[in-house]
């Protein structure tokens, strides 16, 4: 046990000694490092104080004993420095060695000394001898002295420019005085400039190799989690697109003032291997290549320093480097080239149409992509270096200073590259702008307007089938079509990039003529006075000699003029403000003596002004004033206020082709026919075409251009009080909107159409024609001989006094008339209710289960096989002569029976729908009203009277005597002729149905006969095959009160 105790005590003693030694070593190391850092800072400060006076100068320092004759063009460099105003200083070697030792510039040709920024002649001369690419620029000591001097000046002025870029934003004097981080940055920048000049001599990448590596890079990241889409896009970069850059020194000269031209990837003669930044090579696998190269370098440095190079450490370094390589940076490069390719393909068509602006835009993105590609590649390598160094120094005591140094230098390089990119991109944009200027000078035309012209030509080509069909669609011989070429993003982007937004307009309007499906290239003689001036808001087609369509095919911006001014709002920010001097109306002079169609639905009549919480959206309205001619015209209105002077002819105004708001059409104050005031509610869900000011942003590196322009959108108005007011003159017919409209007729003849929506139409006085159309409408004819058509929906038709024609249409409708005139009530489809007046009414329920009530007067009821279960309630006087016409029934196929007080007729034919006709209270006694139908006539003209039926049912038990009470005529042509005469009389008077319209006089015979034949068809008259023969036997009665009408009507 004592032995183990001794061993343990000895081990403990040794551990404590090792700990003391380690602490002692740490303290020594720490103190040494602190002392070294302190001494370096003191030396830097000492040197800095000595060079305050010269810190902003560049001095060429030459040892007095240095023999420059062995150099390559050395004396030309010295002379060039003198010509450029660079001080040439000959010093003793001892003085130079002191500077080298103090600032570590012994191996550099550029450094900081007590004299300022110093070019060391021997090192520079050795550099030129070493790198033939530079020395060949300078040349030997023989040759054209002037040429050599110029080339020498290029080298030294290039170095000056590099320094200016490196030290941009650093006050060198203050940096030297403070001795802080900015001095370190300056020293690192000077060192960097030396390295950059050295890299001129090194091989650079070629475009083709770079393309391949980017594509391979895409393959690698495609399988990485979350980066699949990025990888696939990178693989789509076109090699040919990159290889055909044609990028010359005129474009890349601003990259570090031309000194670092090797970074621009433009040397076609260089090796196909890719060399980036400080010589790190991108292999075919970009990530792997950079990671491997950087990792190997850093691991070697760790090994030399005696630090760990184990597997975990190497993995940490490699993973850190991989993370530092950003796929998004390469994706941005890919996007530039892809956009260039996309625009380039688009440009081909318009180049053939006379506009090459899209090609110029494509060129910009191509060259910008090349610039971005070079800088991105370099920055990627630098990021990998910094990340790897940071990982390698993790956990090491000496790591932090190394990390700060490397990070600072690589950050500085990246900053220089990023700073240099802007002038390069501006140079490209300026070059393209010069091409635009040259074109305008040559052709004397606005370049961007020419772009709109090309877009319009393409529109005509693409839309020819549609445009040429308008003549037929609107039933006119000629079409005058106005289109607006709206703001174009490519044209706007080109104007922004070149800084020429003030020369651009928000679009351009065009007028084209089509006739017989053909585009008229030139204006025909009779259109020689056509006026279309969108700046004044004037359109004139009054001299057209044919029926004409005036149509705004696309939304047309409000009339007026535009002006623009480009101003700078920030260091890199510019805005081109738009000022619109708008007109307050459009004035259209229409065709004088021919019918025309005016489609204004795409006319923009509201220009957005402002928005506020209290007042909502506010607008400037542009009124439409349209003077029509003497023909029959049609006008389709937009959402703004209008003044229509229709002139002579039958003119129709339409509100249903677009969203025109909730209408109130008022003719109650009219002193002449065709005069109406229209108020339209444009709030709520009403969508209007409104003109708005938008902006497009485009960027040239850091420079951002904002261009304002006019555009339009179809949207809700956003103003609860927004209204439009129309004044209509000499308008014969109005078609409402697709909302709930209210029509108030005049004391003259009104023709109203409700269109869609649940509408209220009131004709007031006059012989009116009202159409409910779709929706659940209410139509009131009031006084006059009116025609009311319910259309679709469950409608209510009130004919009022007069001779009225009411047609319910589809839906469950209610039809009602007043007075003692002649009225036609037709239910149509659906379960309808028809109420006659005290006059002579025609009641035709149509399809469905209908209720028909004729009232007083001699009424005419119609029932057919397509009718459903109808109920007739005729509450008339005993002197009335009511008739029921069975339109397509024969008595032989009808069964009659008494059910309570009702007379019931039903069909027994399988082809019929087995509907039941009930004549209510037929048998009711002790009532002052007569509920019987005096005559029932079948399709063949055979007639049964109420008296016949009464006698039959009174003596029903004696069935063999029934035929003695029937009429003696099996068929009688005079019965049908009499029916036709009665129907013609009712229909002719009802709503003036048979009167010819549109100013003609007399009877419209065709319309009248058509209505009569709808009820009494000649096809149903006197067909002898229907009177007996096979299948015409009687049915046995199962009830003493039931009998076939055919047996009752047939006399022996």
UniProtKB/Swiss-Prot annotation:
Originating organism: Actinobacillus pleuropneumoniae (Haemophilus pleuropneumoniae)
Key words, A-Z: Calcium, Cytolysis, Host cell membrane, Host membrane, Lipoprotein, Membrane, Palmitate, Repeat, Secreted, Toxin, Transmembrane, Transmembrane helix, Virulence
Localization of this protein: Secreted; Host cell membrane
Primary localisation category: secreted
GO cellular component terms attached to this protein's record: extracellular region; host cell plasma membrane; membrane
Recorded family membership: Belongs to the RTX prokaryotic toxin (TC 1.C.11) family.
Cited function: Does not have hemolytic activity but shows a strong cytotoxicity towards alveolar macrophages and neutrophils.
Full protein name: RTX-III toxin determinant A from serotype 8
InterPro entries per UniProt: Hemolysin-typ_Ca-bd_CS, Hemolysn_Ca-bd, RTX_C, RTX_pore_form, RTX_toxin/Mannuronan_C5-epim, RTX_toxin_determinant-A, Serralysin-like_metalloprot_C
Post-translational modification: Palmitoylated by ApxIIIC. The toxin only becomes active when modified.
GO terms for MF: calcium ion binding; channel activity; toxin activity
PROSITE patterns: HEMOLYSIN_CALCIUM
The gene coding this protein: apxIIIA
Segments passing through the bilayer: 248-265, 275-334, 372-418
Swiss-Prot/TrEMBL domain comment: The Gly-rich region is probably involved in binding calcium, which is required for target cell-binding or cytolytic activity.
Pfam families reported for this sequence: HemolysinCabind, RTX, RTX_C
Gene3D superfamilies, per the entry: Serralysin-like metalloprotease, C-terminal
Gene Ontology biological-process entries: killing of cells of another organism
Residue ranges of Hemolysin-type calcium-binding repeats: 744-761, 762-779, 780-797, 798-815, 826-843, 844-861
Membrane association type: Multi-pass membrane protein
